[in-house]
Amino acid sequence: MRAYPTIQRPSIKRDPRLHALLAGRLHDPFSFLGPHVEHGHWVVRAFHPHAASIWINTDDGFESMTRAHPAGVFEWWGLIPLPLPYQLRIEEASFEAPAHVYDIYDAYAFPPQVSEHDLYLFNEGRLHQAYRMLGSHLVEMEGVAGVRFSVWAPNAERVSVVGSFNRWDGRIHPMVSHGASGVWELFIPGVPTDSFYKYEIRNRDTGAILLKTDPYARHYEVRPGTAARAPSASRMTWGDARWMAQRAVWDWLATPLNIYEVHAGSWKRHANGSFYSYRELADHLLPYVREMGYTHIELLPISEHPLDESWGYQTTGYFAATSRYGTSDDLKFFINACHQEGIGVILDWVPAHFPQDAFALARFDGSALYEHEDPRMGLHQDWGTHIFNYGRNEVKSFLLSSAHYWLSEFHLDGLRVDAVASMLYLDYSRLPGEWLPNRYGGRENLEAIDFLRELNIMVHQEFPGALTLAEESTAWPGVSRPTYVGGLGFSMKWNMGWMNDTLVYMRNDPVYRRFHHEQLTFGQLYAYSENFVLPFSHDEVVHGKGSLLGKMPGDAWQQFANLRLLFTYQMTYPGKKLNFMGNEFAQGREWNSSRELDWYQLGDGWHEGVKMAARDLNQLYSAVAALHQRDFEPEGFSWVDCHDADNSVISYLRFARNGSFALVVLNFTPVPRYRYRIGVPTSGSYQEIFNSDSRYYGGSDLGNMGSIRTTGQPSMERMDSIVITLPPLAGLIFVHTDLPAINTDG
């Protein structure tokens, strides 16, 4: 086949499409570039501003294209169509080196692929897998491999893909608009794996040119770079089918849940200060977690973020594992290894706000797209970040898809949702006049409430056994109650009230604790209003708050004893458990994300003792059914004595479903209590299965010689009693020797 010179080639110099293309304002490049029928003939146009010459591959070989405009527009005209797809041979002249000649397939010979159905669901806020439509994807079209790019930018006049493969030139690869949906798309053949790219966006109203990274990218360059990376094929082979099947049917309400909260960048580091990779964490963190008896790891946000000091809470890449620690496959390797060892993995996820960095979501297409225009709704005053516009359907699709992506692609076992209180209230951390009420005149963020309910419905329906945990610091009712009864639908909520009361109480000198006894007992008034997690999280050991050990009063002996007592209280009180890394061995310094934990302190006997106590408590918590099986049921707890304020002693029973129980006695003063009588529900022998004052933990080794028998004397409204020695600043756990206490099946 050949081009016919007798064909009259009309001039394009006055063509408005040409002028729009050259001005960077052409919203439908397919109307001008690629193959067309014009004036009864076939024409192929290509725009390559750096080309000296272009040839097109026809049935007769490569034929020269005519330069139709000096800016780099080339044409080929024929009487019959070219077979698709076709290749272009491009020669780029250089004054410093031989001409560079290369062959490419024409991007504008491949029609758009995004479906109208997906666009409809996306615009309705109901597309839970928008990450499959938007972003960059390896695809093959007509036997040609390449990358399909798509992005949402409804207020753009033109969007181009720019990257290392096209000299970052926004003229070369303008995308096609899908009209009112606001989505732009382009398939580019032959994009090299892991190429850097961004979107160049021209705002419709101002003409401003913006350079934005891809919100849906799955991998970014290592900070301080901000470009997205073109995708590469995953080589991950999962080996956690057994774990996933068991998770789908597990009764998590009655199962041990003991979370080790980890900041991946500062748990441990190499001698030169560099991070451990995801794979290295699998080699080092995972064995440690197993040794210590935790059931889950909760990772502080590992979605991509530009600033190390934000700990991940200022997310810019909601679909990408941060490249600080490796690739997505590396993270999958870590999670897979955890599952094979029986450890779950929870991700700290941040849908409450996003940073103002100009390269990312903020004013993405020159308008307030993901955020509110009005700063009274769109600006978080505490953190200087933007608040998502939950009332915008496409934003809802974005966030729901982000959650779906992490749970689906990475087999994560749950999401801890950060800063829920800031989402629920329009006046959160605002003075009168600094916020706008909802349509009913109230302070509740109705759109955020709807979003959270939809999030939880999606997670629980599509990912059986996956958990959602809310960091919610107010008394909002029903956070962990089902949506069908008016709740938000979370699996669990952090018990911030218990945590605050407990730490305030523990800071008191034991001499004065008798005057604050209610801080230990008040929590039972609301303990079953939600499914609670008892957290001693990273938030309690930063910003001048000191370490947990540093909060404990007294000399060194008392500080360590107090901390062992605190952990005994936490691990025996109703609710699932969470501790931040370093708590378990009594790190002395406040956490600093720029260095690893103070592991050298384990050479000190007291620190090693706290670690051993934490390990043994973790193992007892999992082994003794009464300590975990009825965390959310009032029938699982009973006070023995909550009134002994003068001695600062409390005692209570924890019950399993089979009737077995554990007796917990806690002494919050440094004064030993000899012949201290405790009422018990059953006569017989009681085994002391834990004593935080044991010499193995660094204590004084005062106790009850392993077991004790009832006296036959009723006490504290119980049918019998035991008389015990209560060590100073210590907690004791007893079980009845005739009842099957260690029975996780109930």
UniProtKB/Swiss-Prot annotation:
It is an enzyme of class 2 (transferase). Pathway: Glycan biosynthesis; glycogen biosynthesis. It comes from the Bacteria. The active site is at residues 418, 471. It catalyses: Transfers a segment of a (1->4)-alpha-D-glucan chain to a primary hydroxy group in a similar glucan chain. InterPro entries: A-amylase/branching_C, Branching_enzy, GlgB, GlgB_N, GlgB_N_E_set_prok, Glyco_hydro_13_cat_dom, Glyco_hydro_13_N, Glyco_hydro_b. Coiled coil: none annotated. Keywords: Carbohydrate metabolism, Glycogen biosynthesis, Glycogen metabolism, Glycosyltransferase, Transferase. Monomer. Belongs to the glycosyl hydrolase 13 family. GlgB subfamily. HAMAP family: GlgB (MF_00685). This is 1,4-alpha-glucan branching enzyme GlgB. It comes from Nitrosospira multiformis (strain ATCC 25196 / NCIMB 11849 / C 71). The lineage of its organism: Bacteria, Pseudomonadati, Pseudomonadota, Betaproteobacteria, Nitrosomonadales.
